[in-house]
Amino acid sequence: YFQGALRRLPHGVFSHCENLNQLDLPYNIEIINERAFEYCKSLEQITIPSTVRLIDTKAFKDCSRLERVNIASLNTYIRWDVFDGCIFKYKK
């Protein structure tokens, strides 16, 4: 749970949080910095609000169980290697 004026998730803030499996980010977050969720091996789902305008390098690197990423905005800039090491299944 975040409060106040936090607008950026710092570099590696949740890195190696092995018990984190689901996360709904609050609407005050604008930037997810590098490797913020790297190696969160249990993370399966994350909801990213429309206020997020940048998801930086390797933010979700090696989140091997990540199945669902809900991004509310089409204007969010996503670096090419954000999901490095993740394996997604395409669902119609």
Specify the residue positions occupied by each region the protein language model found.
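Structural signature of tandem-repeat unit edges
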Residues: 1-8, 18-31, 41-54, 64-77, ...
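Consensus positions within tandem repeat domains that build extended binding/scaffold surfaces
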Residues: 10-13, 33-36, 56-59, 80-82
